[in-house]
Amino acid sequence: MKPVNVAVVGATGAVGEAMIEILESREFPVDTLYPLASSRSAGKSVQFRGKHNTVQDLSTFDFSQTPIGLFSAGGDISAEYAPIAASAGCVVIDNTSHFRRDKDIPLVIPEVNPEAIADYRSRGIIANPNCSTIGMLVALKPLYDAVGIERINVATYQAVSGTGKAAIEELAGQTARLLNGKAPEPEVYPKQIAFNAIPHIDAFQDNGYTREEMKMVWETQKILGDPNILVNPTCVRVPVFFGHAEAVHIETREPISVEQARSLLEAAEGVTLLDRHEAGGYPTPVTEAAGADPVFVGRVRADISHPRGLNLWVVADNVRKGAALNSVQIAEVLLSEYLQSVS
């Protein structure tokens, strides 16, 4: 593929930094990289291919210079600047939740619905799903295609990096304070996160669910193109730095054996099956997922309470596959299949 210019908006954040690293490690054909951020971060330096690149001020950047823009600087920034970039001819791949529910903007996981990328022509924007939705659907897509899924019950155990750098620092700081006999002093989260579990991610909705939980419902239905699939989530923040875990329980339309499910998962793109019935024969966020690209699946077993039930344990790096990697994978398909004529 012919090299193209790429802009990374939010280049100094955790996801932006990961995007730049993944562009390099996957040898994405970047001609010139434009790291962008707010005025207070402009002037900082990021490394790409062994060279220092100066972070530019997003507010003054001319997006007509680049055909692809990876956005991960928060919903308000995307709301303001993604349409500006798109109107200048830059296809925006947005990692925030701002555009995900818009009917004319595709919501894409390349292993699940790559064909939806074609709809970028509507507004010049492609939305990246929520990190928990990505991991779950990469694991469930082969099962959904084979036997159908009527209902998903899922409990997530989400790392603090999903909140951002301040949350990573808060967990580290609280852990040190508590081990030294000091009060935890929560600021990012409403309660202590160190040595704790908080069943509250994003704002509470009128129905008692949080917005994070409802994202998993809306996004699953949109990505699969199945408004009838039922999703019942509980999202929990846990004291882990990187890597989300999910206990997933599905009810299938047609019966499927554990052996059939394992075979489908072993052959699935983007999935690594680690499922031995022994101590340590399963993936965890820290030992397998953190810093890795695949979605790991283990604890595959029949639901003893339901004739068409199946249980899985799913883990993935929320900053990589849950955000930065998925965005770069979208860009790869976009460039190879739709933008090849870009000069």
Q: What are these model-derived regions, one by one?
A:
Residues M1-I193, N228-L230, S263, G281, ...:
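N-terminal Rossmann-like NAD(P) cofactor-binding subdomain of oxidoreductases
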Residues V231-S343:
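C-terminal active-site/capping subdomain that shapes the small-molecule cofactor and substrate pocket
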Residues S39-S41, C131-S132, T156-T163, A197-Q205, ...:
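Glycine-rich beta-alpha junction loops
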Residues Y120-A127, N196-N207, L312-V314:
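Helix-loop-beta segment of a Rossmann-like dinucleotide-binding subdomain
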Residues A194-F241:
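Oxyanion-binding "anion nests"
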Residues G10, P184, V188, F204-R211, ...:
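A short glycine-/small-residue-rich loop at the edge of a beta-strand within enzyme catalytic domains
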Residues E170, K191-P199, F241-A245, I250:
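Active-site-proximal catalytic alpha-helix in oxidoreductases
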Residues G124-G135, G208-V217, G322-N326:
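A glycine-rich, Thr/Ser-enriched phosphate-binding loop motif common to dinucleotide/cofactor-binding enzymes
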